[in-house]
């Protein structure tokens, strides 16, 4: 029989470590993780690498033997280093082995494709890092005496991270802009909208409006009810440049860490809440908002997250203000606002929490689609409709085509996009709370729009931001349930909650690795022709009507009349006084469907009596319309293409 002290110590260990897990379950779990890691190693490093079948088997057996050896070694070292008994060390290592579930998230890429070895190594490193984190969390749960107080607070660390994050992402953003790495047309479009607004024309841009609409359209409000553009006006007034829009957008993105921290802090410790905020900023759909072409929709996350926070805190008036701010970003936020009303109904809240958001969303939808858009469209067909026209001309016809031809949606790109959207959340972690359902309309719209050639099913475009907010919210709001589950099992809730948050952090980093390719690095490279491109843009008079290559558009967007030289012949009123021709088609970053029109423009200019060459080099030719001459360029019907 043990002494009283020994009995108390044993009881303390059991209280710290949670209830005893039957040995059979531990064995099954470890065996499952072992088989998973073995399969992943085979798929990532052995299969499809040119090895013969016998050699593949030898390498696989060697890898499995190495895993067994490392497992035994880790168990021995842990037991001796931290003076743990067999039960404690086993419990810690079983818990820590869960980190390798991260490999399962990206196993399909390895089984169905052949990812770069660098990506596989980075994923392996991420899994090992997560294993170390889990080990630390579990060890401190077993031995609370090992806990220590960091010299700085979690809030200060998060603030420092956000400062570094903002300057790093903004440096990349500006480097990409100066390296002509952006396609450029969307950035130039919104820059011109702000310029024309300051000169008496509300959010007007002939660069798109004269191209996409057969009838006169004089405002961006014909396509989107995004009154948030007014937010950019004072900043643009201070510095009239495309870079201003990009920097302001990045500020709004990094500020999202604030409401995420507040939401997480409701159920987590300060340090775990800070990790959750960092994880959100590193999710690919959020991180790439800082780098991709500009869109006002990137501002939607901040008010949505604050709306979620005030919803959870039951602060009704601030909640309504946040909803209003979110709705001002774009008309399709009505799905999110209405969804939050339904979430309140699910939670059986009072009538005002349900009725007011739902009624507001319906009224805003009616105002946008029945009043605002018809007024500014002036009878023209909405450009947005081209994204879905392939499905049919009426809602009923579209629905029938979707039901009878599911292959229209179940394309490789759409399936890959859906997977990339959920990778950062382990594919399933968001399912623990119904908040994720609010993301469904947005994912569906993106998948449907992709079939119409609108490039909406891309995880790093602005379209993916709103669904990501609600997928992440599904994880955050489930943490309270995770804690309750742990308590019912007699375990420390902080341990399981930490496991979820840390898993999302490493899954977000790993997902970013898998969606980042060589193109993202090439966009930052300085090329030999960049200096001349800057000189060419500077040669164009500030008040002249100009047509330039798309990548050059942001540099010359501060003017009343702006055209894409790539599609100049497709404009309804092509009246450019200066036309810049890039002689290298590869720099145009365009598909072959535009090549014929561009070649036709070059031939017309070479034989034109109205346009004269004022600059010519191996890279560029600048044509100037003679004084008093009319452009008289022929018009060709524009291809159906969406701008955003």
Task: List each language-model region with its residue ranges.
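Signature aromatic-anchored transmembrane alpha helix within multi-pass, membrane-resident enzymes
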Residues: 89-102, 156-163, 271, 358-362, ...
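Transmembrane-helix signature of polytopic, membrane-embedded enzymes
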Residues: 254-285, 301-302, 317-321
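Membrane-interface transmembrane helices that cradle and orient dolichyl/undecaprenyl
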Residues: 296-299, 304-319, 345-348
């Amino acid at each position: 029989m043990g002494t009283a002290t020994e009995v108390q110590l044993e009881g303390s260990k059991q209280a710290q470590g949670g209830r005893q897990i039957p040995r059979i379950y531990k064995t099954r779990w470890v065996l499952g993780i072992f088989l998973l890691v073995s399969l992943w190693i085979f798929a990532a490093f052995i299969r499809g690498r040119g090895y013969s079948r016998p050699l593949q088997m030898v390498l696989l057996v060697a890898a499995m033997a190495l895993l067994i050896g490392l497992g035994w070694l880790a168990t021995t070292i842990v037991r001796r280093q931290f003076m743990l008994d067999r039960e404690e060390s086993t419990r810690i290592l079983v818990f820590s082995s869960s980190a390798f579930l991260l490999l399962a998230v990206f196993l399909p890429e390895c089984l169905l494709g052949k990812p770069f070895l660098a990506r596989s190594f980075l994923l392996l490193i991420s899994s090992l890092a997560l294993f170390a984190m889990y080990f630390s969390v579990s060890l401190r749960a077993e031995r609370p005496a090992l806990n220590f107080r960091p010299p700085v607070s979690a809030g200060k660390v998060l603030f420092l991270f956000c400062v570094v994050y903002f300057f790093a992402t903004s440096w990349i953003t500006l480097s990409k802009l100066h390296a002509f790495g952006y396609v450029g047309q969307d950035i130039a479009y919104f820059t011109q909208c702000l310029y024309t607004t300051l000169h008496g024309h509300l959010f007007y841009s002939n660069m798109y409006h004269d191209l996409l609409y057969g009838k006169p359209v004089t405002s961006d409000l014909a396509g989107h009810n995004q009154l948030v553009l007014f937010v950019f006006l004072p900043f643009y007034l201070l510095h009239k440049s495309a870079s201003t829009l990009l920097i302001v957008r990045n500020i709004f993105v990094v500020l999202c860490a604030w409401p995420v921290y507040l939401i997480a802090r409701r159920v987590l410790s300060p340090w775990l809440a800070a990790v959750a905020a960092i994880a959100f900023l590193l999710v690919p759909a959020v991180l790439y908002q800082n780098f991709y072409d500009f869109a006002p929709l990137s501002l939607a996350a901040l008010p949505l997250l604050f709306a979620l926070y005030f919803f959870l805190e039951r602060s009704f008036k601030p909640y309504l203000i946040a909803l209003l701010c979110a709705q001002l970003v774009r008309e399709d936020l009505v799905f999110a606002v209405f969804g939050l009303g339904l979430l309140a109904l699910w939670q059986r809240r009072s009538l005002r929490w349900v009725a007011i958001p739902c009624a507001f969303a319906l009224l805003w939808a009616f105002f946008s689609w029945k009043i605002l858009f018809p007024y500014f469209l002036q009878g023209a067909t909405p450009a947005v409709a081209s994204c879905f026209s392939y499905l049919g001309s009426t809602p009923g016809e579209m629905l029938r085509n979707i039901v009878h031809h599911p292959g229209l949606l179940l394309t490789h790109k759409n399936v890959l996009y859906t997977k990339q959207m959920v990778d950062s959340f382990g594919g399933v972690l968001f399912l623990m709370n119904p908040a994720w359902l609010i993301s469904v309309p947005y994912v569906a719209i993106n998948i449907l729009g992709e079939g119409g050639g609108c490039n909406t099913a891309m995880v790093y475009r602005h379209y993916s931001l709103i669904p990501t907010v609600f997928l992440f919210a599904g994880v955050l709001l489930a943490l309270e349930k995770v804690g309750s589950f742990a308590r019912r099992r007699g375990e420390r809730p902080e341990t399981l909650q930490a496991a979820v948050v840390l898993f999302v952090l490493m899954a977000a980093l790993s997902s970013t690795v898998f969606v980042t390719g060589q193109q993202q690095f090439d966009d930052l490279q300085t090329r030999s022709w960049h200096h001349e491109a800057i000189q060419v843009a500077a040669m164009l008079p500030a008040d002249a009507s100009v047509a330039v290559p798309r990548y050059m558009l942001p540099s010359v967007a501060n003017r009343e009349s702006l055209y894409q030289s790539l599609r100049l012949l497709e404009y309804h009123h092509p009246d450019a006084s200066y036309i810049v021709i890039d002689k290298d088609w590869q720099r145009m970053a365009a598909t072959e469907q535009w090549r014929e029109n561009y070649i036709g423009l070059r031939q017309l200019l070479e034989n034109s009596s109205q346009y004269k060459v004022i600059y010519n080099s191996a890279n560029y030719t600048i044509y100037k319309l003679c004084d008093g001459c009319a452009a008289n360029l022929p018009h060709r019907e524009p291809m159906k293409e969406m701008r955003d």
